[in-house]
Amino acid sequence: MQKANKRIDKEYKELTENPPEGFIIKAENIFDTWDVYMKGPEETPYVGGTFLIKMKFPDNYPFKPPKATFSTKMYHPSIKKDSGEICKDIYEEGWVPTKTIKGVLEILKSMLVAPNTDTPLETEIANEYLKEKSKFDATVKEYVTKYAQ
């Protein structure tokens, strides 16, 4: 087994046996793509939703980060509405091989708790979050009801 595969295998076993709170991880081929199901964090407008994140591993993982995208349609400043692409600033920039998937999952969850509006992929959503928080929250709740049940 290649070094990268050993690392992925080890992380997958750890995360499926003892997942972080609010996460379920599944995969048909653990060396390619994982299906990560994340519960919406408490005390956020995302609560009550379950969000599917596709985690795709490059051949040279852990030297390059996995590519995470939301398959569930999201309303968030750092997530592209049309593609589910996540802002690279969130976890890809500054990636080092000692970072783990568990760490990435914690970052993705914290992103829903406290959105970063400094470098948004969706500028209008970031502005709404900053200027009309109640409208932002209401739209998120609509998305949760419509797409994340």
Predicted regions mapped to residue ranges:
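UBC/E2-like fold recognition across ubiquitin and ubiquitin-like conjugation systems
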Residues: 1-149
